[in-house]
Amino acid sequence: MANSKSAKKRALQSEKRRQHNASRRSMLRSYVKKVIAAIQAGDHAAATEAFNAAQPILDRMATKGLIHKNKAARHKARLNTRIKALAA
């Protein structure tokens, strides 16, 4: 347990940040899951709409440092490839 005043404050801030990041990460996963669900259902229009909603969220989370920018790019590329395969 933290003994000094500053260590206690850091522990509180760390926990607060952890909960905030967990919430953001959960939201991000929900957006990605919506796209995947639409792809698996075979609904190109819904998949495209969900992807367009998820794209800026992925970019924002990468900018904020929640996920790595390469991970965001990888998610977007793979989802987009699967959506394009639906149209073909």
From Swiss-Prot:
Region (Disordered): 1-27
CC annotations in GO: cytosol; small ribosomal subunit
One GO BP annotation of this record: translation
Keyword DNA-binding: no
InterPro entries linked to this entry: Ribosomal_bS20, Ribosomal_bS20_sf
Domain of life from the UniProt record: Bacteria
Keywords: Ribonucleoprotein, Ribosomal protein, RNA-binding, rRNA-binding
GO MF term list: small ribosomal subunit rRNA binding; structural constituent of ribosome
A family per Pfam: Ribosomal_S20p
Keyword Ribosomal protein found: yes
General function of this protein: Binds directly to 16S ribosomal RNA.
UniProt similarity note: Belongs to the bacterial ribosomal protein bS20 family.
UniProt cross-references to PANTHER family, sorted A to Z: 30S RIBOSOMAL PROTEIN S20, SMALL RIBOSOMAL SUBUNIT PROTEIN BS20C
Protein name, entry field: Small ribosomal subunit protein bS20
Organism of this sequence: Shewanella woodyi (strain ATCC 51908 / MS32)
